[in-house]
């Protein structure tokens, strides 16, 4: 039974949250099903027609089946589009099935295709098209003789045959007429009726899907008029015996019980009441003895509930309760006609007395209803859903008084002693009763308060909570009530329901619940027409708008709060339910939402809400305490802002008691030692946010003792960041730094623009001292604290502060891994520059000026060379990223105010370093460097002076063209950055960056960086001067980075690529060209005494490439290779021999006379053998090629 038959009923049991609620799902829903017809008709016809041709080829057979499955799956949501085509598809496939000459494999394949069609369209619709004449019964039945129930490859055949047989069972003739004479001598055989029943019973206990089809067959067959008289009793007896001897604790028992329960449920559904009633009590008794509620098999419990409710319906006469509440008619025409004739007359329940006496209700009904009520509390949704439907169906046949008792029992599910499963089941049951008109208006006064509680139901369980399914189902109840009742019936509850639905729409944690509430609100607006401002709200809070949680809390809530009916309920909900929520994100959003809503109801917030929040700050519950402090901070700030806008003092909203309460928060937490431990982390962050907001609100606390307490908290937090858990460290650090900036600006100023001398001395001295702390996190916090100080606090101390921060950026052996400290020091330097501003001739102790600007630039540019790595990877990248950002901010600041301070050499170094970073291998940092580079190039207010080759850069990177470039994508970044190789000012640095990328490990980076480099090399192949310049630059990069493995190893790989691709072929015309001579010398120096296998392998490839250059250099290269043939590492010897062999094949460097012998030595020698053996073969190669034999150098004697 599908769970999606009604909105919101199939809510997930476990709380599922989608914090990153992106637009992917929304887009899919917005597009909807766009299909208009079965577009693959011709392809399908051809596919089905060629089944005999693909039968022999397993690959082709599986391909055809998969293709058909893909085609059909497209129509899962619009299966009706297949209806005009079902008949010809069925006929095509049945031709193979009914053809006596068809191979068994073809028959099985045809049934696989038939199953796929039935799965998509649904077997009830598809089966009608199967042939079901009298002549079809025996052939279908005979097909079962060839079936093996244990063959797991052909279960689709058995499934479809059972369904086909269930259709043929509907023929309107007695089966005995098909039997002929069963008792002829020597020809005794079973009757058709017995054969069908035997097939059905045998397949009810198999483990595959044929079991489901067998249950359908039984229900159609046993309920036939001729069969029920002879076989129903015996089949029910067999079923009850099967249930009795089966145990749900074994797999075989579960399978047998599943099939039997399905069959019984189908029989009591399709059979006539008078036929089933004599057996109902016995079946119920047997079912009770099976104790299915104790099973851990969800499906068995669901089938048990389904069977119980159908037994209950069998006990009761099939009648429509005259007492039920009705709104409108099922027929739209009748409903419209009635509304025209009686526009104001509501349709209510019949006034006639209930003619059904309680004596007509059998005593078994009580047991049935009791079991259904237990099913409402089951741990699985599908069981609760089935039980809820059963409750609704049963109540519809009960007398009014008994049905009201059932309603009362359902309401008992909503006590706080019950689990979330009971609440969910109760909601589903109430919805079923309401939509069937069985929940009379007189009961609404009891039901509505329960539903309002269910709309906010949430229980903490472990690290998360349960209840999202309850809230979802409660929305379903509201949706059902909107359709079930006339507006005047719900009018007394409109205010409460509308407020509750609005609250769920904007403030529920779960996106599914927000959307369900939005749908329920929309249904009520449309059906009831009495919800205040309904149209305005539902157009703003629609299905897609409520998909984003932050948007709901901060934007939509503000709009809805503009309607006074909803303002106070929303504020009340936030204070009561969300400020102390277990999810920290919800607490933070709730505090911000309260800040917004306080603007809508300032008097109520100040008079009622703020005192409650203050009392909650001392709660023993950590989450409540944390959320309350955050809320106090945000509300106080909001009320101050409002008072300022209205030209009133903040004391008009916050009286002296409230002010005192704000001041007492820190001291009370400190006295209770609540700043310690994991809970203390939350409270430190919250109080820091409180300090910031109170300071920004300019509360009159200057000179108060609380300021010292707040300052202690900030200092203690920054000094002990290393004791805070890593996942919350960043948030606490940011909160403390922001609090310090606000506190100093407001409460440490003696008068505007002048700091308290004692506070300035104490804080600056403290933070500068802590910059040398052995704890990295302490350095981070204090560096950022210095960066956050206001300008008047740095007055007279700027030189000292910058010197301290500069010292943090220097790498020493003891703090080489302190990359985060260096990053935060750079951020602090940048922020200080923005704070103090620029004055070209100003004092260096007060502003950025001519005297200190070059030193600041040197500090930042030096940090671009930070390539520190540790177990976390390239941590120096954090430093380089911060340095690039700081350089951009500083340069733009100088460009706006004092462009003359930007000197040409400095600007050239800056732009070249950025170009290098924009050519390197890490996507994220390459993209950041490119953005900074282009921001400086295209700055126009005014333009940055002295940018090297500005006209060429603007031509290569036009503003409009590069705006859409994804610099993080290697395919887009490297081809553009490689163009800078043509500009001499940038060539060195770009080549340095590209060399690292071309010789890297990431496939996409290597491919596109190589492609960009080779494109440039191709352009200069016919320009010897340009090639000479490029070669000189390349050698300079190599020379400057000798023994620097970060650059030299990838550079060797880059050189190998370039030599192998003929980038320097023009140099081969000259013997002993300076380029190759110097390159050989550099390579020898790089691998001298090296034990790095990767470096040695890369150098071998370069040596092999250098062989192409004629002259004395070739002999030296061969000598170097022959030295490596006797390297101590066997892997290097083997690798050298392999590459030399390829080199001999590639380049014509070996005389023809000795070529075969050289290749034979290289290929036949075991180069990983003992060194004396290898050395002899190496010397032989030296003799053949005329290269002097290397001589062993004796080790100096040890004295």
UniProtKB/Swiss-Prot annotation:
Transmembrane feature ranges: none
Chain positions covered by the region annotation Disordered: 1-23, 337-361
GO cellular component: a single term: adherens junction
Alphabetical list of Gene3D superfamilies matching this protein: Leucine-rich Repeat Variant (1.25.10.10)
GO BP annotations listed: adherens junction assembly; bicellular tight junction assembly; cell morphogenesis involved in neuron differentiation; microtubule cytoskeleton organization; mitotic cell cycle; negative regulation of cell-substrate adhesion; negative regulation of microtubule polymerization; post-chaperonin tubulin folding pathway
Pfam families noted in UniProt: ARM_TBCD (PF23579), TFCD_C (PF12612)
Keyword Repeat (UniProt): yes
Start-end of Acidic residues biased regions: 14-23
GO molecular function term, any single one: GTPase activator activity
HEAT repeats: 368-406, 603-639, 757-793, 1111-1147
InterPro entries: ARM-like, ARM-type_fold, TBCD, Tubulin_specific_chaperoneD_C
Localization of this protein: Cell junction, Tight junction; Lateral cell membrane; Cytoplasm; Cell junction, Adherens junction
Family statement: Belongs to the TBCD family.
Assembly behavior: Found in a complex with at least ARL2, PPP2CB, PPP2R1A, PPP2R2A, PPP2R5E and TBCD. Interacts with PPP2CB. Part of a supercomplex made of cofactors A to E. Cofactors A and D function by capturing and stabilizing tubulin in a quasi-native conformation. Cofactor E binds to the cofactor D-tubulin complex; interaction with cofactor C then causes the release of tubulin polypeptides that are committed to the native state. Interacts with ARL2; interaction is enhanced with the GDP-bound form of ARL2. Does not interact with ARL3, ARL4A and ARL4D. Interacts with beta tubulin. Interacts with TBCE.
Role summary: Tubulin-folding protein implicated in the first step of the tubulin folding pathway and required for tubulin complex assembly. Involved in the regulation of microtubule polymerization or depolymerization, it modulates microtubule dynamics by capturing GTP-bound beta-tubulin (TUBB). Its ability to interact with beta tubulin is regulated via its interaction with ARL2. Acts as a GTPase-activating protein (GAP) for ARL2. Induces microtubule disruption in absence of ARL2. Increases degradation of beta tubulin, when overexpressed in polarized cells.
UniProt-recorded name of the protein: Tubulin-specific chaperone D
Source species: Bos taurus (Bovine)
Annotated gene: TBCD
